[in-house]
Structures are given as C-alpha cells and as structure tokens.
C-alpha cells in the first residue's frame, strides 16, 4: 500500500492511497466461493452453479462491497501510520487515472484533523461566582407564591381595586370602526397582573358591577398587533362581576393540600426550605458553570473542524424538531430549520468539548464512585420512591454515564475555580429565580 499525505489547510488533509489489486481480487474470489455454496441460480440446484456463473450474477456487487471495505481499511491503516487524529468523516474519491493494468486501485480521502490544543494558563483569569443566601424572607416569598396559586375569589359589592378579579364585556373602536380582537364578552382577568394595557386596567379600577363607561387606550408603537400598533382606541367597558382575592391561611388544611399528610405546618416550612435551597443550589451551579465555560473558551481560542460543527448542527436541529413534535406540532409539514440558527451554539459546544477533554486528560480529573452515587441519590430524592430510582440507575452501566459526565463537569468547574481568580457576586433570590 502506497500513501502520500498532503496538507490542504490548517486542519484539512488529503491522503492519496494506492491499494494492490492482488489483495482486492483475492478477497473477491474468496467471497464468491462462499456465495457459491448457497447461490440460487435458475437451472442449478442451490450451491451447484459453476463459479463463472456465480461471478456473472454476483461478481459486481461482491466486488463493490470488497472495494468499500478495503478502502476503509486502507484509510484506517494510513491514518494510523501517519499518526493523524481524524475529525468527522472522510470524503473518498477514486482516482481519475485508475488503470487495472497498473495492478493497483488508487483513491483519495479528504478530511479534517483535530486542532493541536495547548491549554492556556488560568492564572490571573477572573471568574464571577454567583452566591445567594437563602433567608426566612425567601421561604416566606415561596410560601406566598404557593398561597397565591390557590387563590379563590369572593364576589363583592364595591368598586374594583388592584388584585380583584373582574368579569367584563368590552367593545373597542378606532376612528369609530370596530377592529379584530377588540371586543369580548364575559372576559375575566385579575387587576394588577399586567394582562391588559395599563390605561385599560386603570379605567376598570373604581368601576362597580353593572357600571359601564368609555375608556381611551393608546396602543404602543411596538404592540404585537401590527394593525393597531401606535393607534388610539375607545373601549366601551361593562363590569359584570367584581371579586376579591382570598388567600388560604397557612394552617393544617394548607399543609395537607401540599402533601404534608399530618398537616404539620412546621414540616411544610422545612420541606419548602429544603426544596428552595436545592433549587437555588442548582441554579447557582448552572450559572457558575456557564461563567467557567466562558473563561475556558476565552483562554483557549482555537480553529474548529467544520465537519464537527456541522455534525453538531444536525444534532441540534434534530433535537429542536423532537421538541416541537412533543409540543404537538406536525414537524413533517414544517420547512427545514436554517442551519445558521444553530451555528453559534454548535461551535461553542464543539469548542467546549475539545477544551474539556484536554483539560480532563491533562489534569487527570475523574468522577469518583462516591460522587456519582451522591448525584444519583440527589436526583432520586425528588421522586416518591427514591430507592427504586437508584436501583434503576445501577442496573445498567450505561445509565450511569449521564450522572458521571455531569459530575466530571462539576469537577472541571471546581478545578478552574481553584486556579483562577474568583470574584464572588451576591445575587438576589428574585434575580436568580427570574422574578426580578
């Protein structure tokens, strides 16, 4: 086998390979002999047809299979000899001047290689580490949210006020003409939640059941309804019902409704505190991991094999379609999503994959069995029967790959934080939970 390597670019390579036809022909004859033992050819009993007849019927397909295998085998040997790290899949092309009389089959393989990566120093690199203290106030806020989720409304005979639920009829006109979406009957909404435009809500506040009035409302220029954006409408509003919000008391009934079977309010608070702290820890870990990953990318600029980026784009596109399908959309009728929509995300994921692999290898980072077990137990704790979840994970080594990879990422984060300059930043509970 003859091999010639050519560098086409920073990461692109081409191997020109010549395979001896004697090896290919020998393998073809060996395969045909095997096929002949069971070949069914008209006029002959199975396995009794002459080899020439078998070759006439099956020779082309057998030769094609053998040639494909020999090309792949020859490429693998050449790559090993040249000590190349192939990224993605090669593109094979037969040589234009192939001549059987020359006794060889020539082809080329064009491909990309992994970039040489020398990890950048983390000394002096700054990482912003978010921290969040969970106090009684945060627990109280969470309990308040749970109470509001169980709000009931009692009808009242007074003017509508903030937090009241009102049921109204309304009909809007612009320049005296009705417009699409501008009217409704028996429409319920809660004042103060921002469901309606501020001028509309302000007009309803102070109205009583049975009262009607006209309210002028200006639609913002960037309003989602383009037909009315930037225009002024007059709404005739009739209030049909006013009801005030009644929050449940924090008592045994409330605790039971949230799964505390004996109604012990102190147990409820302890359970909520545990869940809040777990969620805070999860969000902090995700936020800090993202900060660490950005530091690694900034410290290790590298050219990416585009074959790997395209593979990741395909994976992300497939994942996006699956997500849409799970939401009930008919993805078959949708046009293909543009690749550029995923390019930046794909490039980031490929870069991080290369950097993390090198970092783990260079620093011999591992996920210990104890860490993996702790992660599985943490996940299982949120289920009704944790022991069954733990058993399920440990029934198959493949199932442990997920928690193992996440633990390894956590170890990378801890390693980077131990090497870089860490600046702690206090983050409020509301900001972390997305309520700010």
Swiss-Prot record:
Catalytic activity field: [protein]-peptidylproline (omega=180) = [protein]-peptidylproline (omega=0)
Compartments (UniProt record): Cytoplasm
SUPFAM superfamilies referenced in this protein's UniProt entry, alphabetically: FKBP-like (SSF54534), Triger factor/SurA peptide-binding domain-like (SSF109998), Trigger factor ribosome-binding domain (SSF102735)
Keywords assigned by UniProt, alphabetized: Cell cycle, Cell division, Chaperone, Cytoplasm, Isomerase, Rotamase
Gene Ontology cellular-component terms listed: cytoplasm
Family to which the UniProt record says this protein belongs: Belongs to the FKBP-type PPIase family. Tig subfamily.
Stated name of the protein: Trigger factor
Coiled coil: none
Domain (PPIase FKBP-type): residue spans on this chain: 163-248
High-level lineage: Bacteria, Pseudomonadati, Pseudomonadota, Betaproteobacteria, Neisseriales
Function: Involved in protein export. Acts as a chaperone by maintaining the newly synthesized protein in an open conformation. Functions as a peptidyl-prolyl cis-trans isomerase.
A Gene Ontology molecular function term of the record: ribosome binding
GO BP annotations, alphabetical order: 'de novo' cotranslational protein folding; cell division; chaperone-mediated protein folding; protein transport; protein unfolding
Superkingdom to which the source organism belongs: Bacteria
EC code(s) of this entry: 5.2.1.8
Domains: entry comment: Consists of 3 domains; the N-terminus binds the ribosome, the middle domain has PPIase activity, while the C-terminus has intrinsic chaperone activity on its own.
């Amino acid at each position: 086998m003859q091999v010639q390597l050519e560098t086409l670019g920073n990461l692109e390579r081409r191997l020109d390979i010549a395979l001896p036809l004697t090896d290919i022909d020998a393998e073809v004859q060996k395969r045909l002999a095997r096929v002949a033992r069971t070949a069914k050819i008209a006029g002959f009993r199975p396995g009794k047809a002459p080899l020439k007849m078998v070759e006439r019927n099956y020779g082309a397909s057998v030769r094609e299979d053998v040639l494909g295998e020999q090309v792949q085998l020859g490429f693998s040997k050449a790559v090993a000899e040249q000590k190349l790290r192939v990224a993605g899949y090669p593109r094979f092309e037969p040589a234009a001047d192939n001549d059987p009389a020359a006794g060889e089959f020539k082809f080329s393989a064009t491909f990309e290689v992994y970039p040489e990566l020398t990890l950048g120093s983390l000394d002096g690199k700054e990482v912003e580490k978010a921290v969040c203290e969970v106090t009684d106030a945060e627990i109280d806020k969470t309990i308040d949210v749970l109470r509001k989720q169980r709000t009931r409304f009692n009808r009242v005979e007074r003017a509508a006020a903030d937090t009241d639920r009102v049921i109204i009829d309304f009909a809007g006109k612009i320049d005296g003409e009705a417009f699409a979406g501008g009217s409704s009957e028996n429409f319920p909404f809660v004042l103060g939640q921002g469901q309606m435009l501020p001028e509309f809500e302000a007009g309803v506040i102070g109205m009583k059941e049975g009262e009607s009035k006209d309210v002028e409302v200006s639609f913002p220029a960037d309003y989602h309804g383009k037909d009315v954006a930037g225009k002024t409408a007059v709404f005739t509003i009739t209030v049909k019902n006013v009801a005030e919000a009644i929050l449940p008391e924090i008592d045994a009934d409330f605790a039971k409704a949230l799964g505390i079977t004996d109604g012990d309010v102190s147990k409820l608070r302890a359970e909520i505190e545990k869940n809040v702290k777990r969620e805070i820890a999860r969000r902090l870990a995700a936020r800090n991991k993202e900060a660490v990953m950005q530091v690694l990318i900034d410290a290790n600029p590298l050219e990416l094999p585009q074959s790997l980026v395209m593979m990741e784009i395909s994976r992300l596109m497939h994942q996006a379609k699956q997500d849409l399908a799970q939401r009930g959309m008919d993805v078959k009728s949708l046009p293909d999503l543009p690749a550029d929509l995923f390019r930046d995300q794909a490039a980031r994921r490929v870069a991080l994959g290369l950097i993390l692999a090198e970092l783990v290898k260079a620093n011999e980072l591992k996920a210990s069995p104890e860490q993996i077990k702790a992660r599985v137990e943490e996940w299982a704790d949120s289920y009704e029967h944790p022991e069954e979840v733990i058993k399920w994970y440990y029934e198959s080594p493949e199932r442990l790959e997920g928690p193992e990879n996440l633990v390894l990422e956590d170890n990378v984060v801890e390693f980077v934080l131990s090497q870089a300059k860490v600046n702690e930043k206090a983050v409020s509970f509301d900001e972390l939970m997305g309520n700010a």
